[in-house]
Amino acid sequence: MNNIPYICGVTFAPFVPAGSFSQERARQSLRTMKENTNANFIILAPNGLQETPQSEEICYTSAATMTDDELKGMIEYAQSLGLRVALKPTANCKNGIWRAHINFFDEDVPCEPKWGNWFASYMEFQSHYARISQEMGCEMHITGCEMVMSEHREKEWRQTIAEIRKDFKGLVSYNTDKYQEHNVHWWDCVDVISSSGYYPIDDWENQLNRIEKVVNQFQKPFFFAEAGCMSTAGSKNVPNDWTIRGGIDLQGQADWYQTMFDACEKRSWVKGYALWSWTDRLYAASQVENHCDYEIFAKPAEVVVKNHYQKKAQA
């Protein structure tokens, strides 16, 4: 199994619109993130938008997506801070339906949207950013995120990754969703297996046992390209549910992070995390009680993350 340096990572300002990365507050937020977490790695996630899960065209040139120049500037700035960078161009749906539900008929039907047309647009989207990854010296290119209903289209995914490799010579990964690691049958064509680690606080050992079988089968490095828990009461039991509403539970979020780190430390094959997520518009630390989301800034979970990442940096 090829090894990779341990990833003490954070997903920074995913899906921000044009203009966001040109603001000084975004750079200040990135500096604060590095100082407060001891992170050595970030994922940047440009936003590609299609109208619905059954739309064939992905747009990444509108005002809803950071410009190429902004993205390059943020990559360069992050690297100047000593951060390793990965790009994860991500397809989303304008109507708010989660990208995992992007799906088409398996057999082409006249007058109906088709996988072939969608993958052609998706490949163009990914290749555009793969060229930026190569130009800017990014360490990794992550070819997609939580595209659950598409993952059985093995031929198209292999073709997409082969095309990306023509433009990008670094590490290539794909970020599958929680509970799906064993359902991807084409891990052999990526360099690094990654997934979204939103597992209940009391289920980490069970899920890691399952994932370990996949890692052993394919003999690839593994990390969690996303992982996080909201500081909302109940989130630690179902951390993937961003619709949970309730009172603030700062300690519950911190406990979830500590449980994840403790469980994964027993597994040498877990090579890190890119935690979800850190905003480009930080709230005032005094207002933390008003923020029950995945953010960890000025919350007890931030201390848990900093301690773990500091320990890994010294190892």
PLM features: residue spans?
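Aromatic-rich peripheral "rim/lid" segments of glycoside hydrolase catalytic domains that contact
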Residues: N2-I4, F21, A263, R267-A315
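The substrate-binding groove and active-site-proximal loops of carbohydrate-active enzymes
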Residues: A13-S20, S55-D68, D108-S121, G144-E151, ...
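Short, acidic/polar
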Residues: G19-E35, F119-I132, D177-W186, A254-A263
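Aromatic- and glycine-enriched glycan-recognition loops and surfaces
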Residues: G19-K34, C59-S80, E124
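Glycoside hydrolase catalytic-domain groove-lining segments
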Residues: M66-D68, G73, S80-R84, K88, ...
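Active-site neighborhood of glycoside hydrolase catalytic domains
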Residues: E124-F125, M140, M147-N175
